[in-house]
Amino acid sequence: MTQTHPIHVFSEIGKLKKVMLHRPGKEIENLMPDYLERLLFDDIPFLEDAQKEHDAFAQALRNEGVEVLYLENLAAESLTNQEIREQFIDEYIGEANVRGRATKKAIRELLLNIKDNKELIEKTMAGIQKSELPEIPSSEKGLTDLVESNYPFAIDPMPNLYFTRDPFATIGNGVSLNHMFSETRNRETLYGKYIFTHHPEYGGKVPMVYEREETTRIEGGDELVLSKDVLAVGISQRTDAASIEKLLVNIFKQNLGFKKVLAFEFANNRKFMHLDTVFTMVDYDKFTIHPEIEGDLRVYSVTYENQDLHIEEEKGDLADLLAKNLGVEKVELIRCGGDNLVAAGREQWNDGSNTLTIAPGVVIVYNRNTITNAILESKGLKLIKINGSELVRGRGGPRCMSMPFEREDL
């Protein structure tokens, strides 16, 4: 926290001082094979090992002098009185689309009976199985209760929460509180709402450049802060162009200091779900990139003049474009998997491009992406390698699992 701003992020590579994570919890154990697609998962991580891997990730950050915050703690600290607590519970139930009146009442009573705030937050994250509620007489069941009688959950779990990068994004001194691609993940942004409204340190003290009530979608994996002057945003499977326009108008109007935005349009599919799964900044003049996006990639330059956005498609070489906008002589694009198409596909799927830079040239990576890691090391980068055999099953890497709150200026 700076003296005047609790959020301070003006680059992707400035020394990381403070970061928010979420330790995977019981929500992971509420994944079932029949409902993986509904919950945006491809597989079921083993929770015990996922927690060990995540704890090692957090410790690696602490070893580098980073203060680690946890989403579950910040959310719990935001429930500062009984009125806010009940408001949170009612909003949580409302957004879970619980339609049966008797079911709503039973869920509300269950949650109100949890007196510890952190336990309450973790329960809302884990979801609520129907077996946890008292039997509801048939005469009191709503149509939804009857139609979905075989579905085991009264409220779905939120297994994607350990990817803290997406529900909101820190941009300069502000925050984009996102409206997410799927209903499953959109509920996650409720925690950010309460943190930035009611938390003793952050509530009401951070300018909002996007609100979760918007109807168009945007996710934090598509929001990158390249420098104090330049942002990059992805037009992807999870983020649409209309959201980007709203975001950019707000950023420019809030006078956060940014002068230009580079909008990257690339393939719309799950393996390239966010810009940061195919493109991350690792040093002043170096980026990782997945070679498969390069052929179809289109880049637009966006500025704000006379109360309006000015958009122009950029032509030519991506490395030259980045160098020009970052004020460096030359930019090197380091290809995930090198020149081998098979290795590139495999290591991108396992988040070889999704690196977390904690200082210029110092990067946290999954140890499993051996080819990409060897290339990064050959370019002079210092790698901090973590095990992610279970964490990667959720299709996210170190950048996906972290939300910077404070970085040193470059």
UniProtKB/Swiss-Prot annotation:
It is found in: Cytoplasm. The active site is at 400 (amidino-cysteine intermediate). It is an enzyme of class 3 (hydrolase). The keyword Cytoplasm applies. It holds the Pfam family ADI. InterPro entries: Arg_deiminase. This is Arginine deiminase. It comes from Streptococcus agalactiae serotype V (strain ATCC BAA-611 / 2603 V/R). The lineage of its organism: Bacteria, Bacillati, Bacillota, Bacilli, Lactobacillales. The gene is arcA.
